[in-house]
């Protein structure tokens, strides 16, 4: 269990820089049975830079949710796997199931879907 906690620390946005790192951390997150929110981002994307600190605050507030940040240029294969067409894209999942998606830096929508799916995840 300690290994899982180390791979997916609560209260943080977990950045993955290699496919191997991503696969290991996503596997641990899926096994934790927590809601997972993935922010697909890019360094050159102004809306991504706008929403990044808000995403960090959400991670600090929702300790029962696993938050990931994936740079689409670094991990293009992962972005393709999740059918990311625009940045930022937020994907919500639990276990193997993709629950929802938000495209764009829509703070209210991101928070609303986070609350909706974290309540379902807790049930």
UniProtKB/Swiss-Prot annotation:
Family annotation (InterPro entries): Thioredoxin-like_sf, Thioredoxin_CS, Thioredoxin_domain, Thioredoxin_H-type-like
Residue intervals of the Thioredoxin domain: 2-119
Record localization: Cytoplasm
GO CC annotation: cytoplasm
Keywords for this protein: Cytoplasm, Disulfide bond, Electron transport, Redox-active center, Transport
Disulphide linkage map: 45-48
Biological role: Participates in various redox reactions through the reversible oxidation of the active center dithiol to a disulfide. The H form is known to activate a number of cytosolic enzymes.
Annotated family: Belongs to the thioredoxin family. Plant H-type subfamily.
Name this protein carries in UniProt: Thioredoxin H-type
Species this protein is from: Brassica campestris
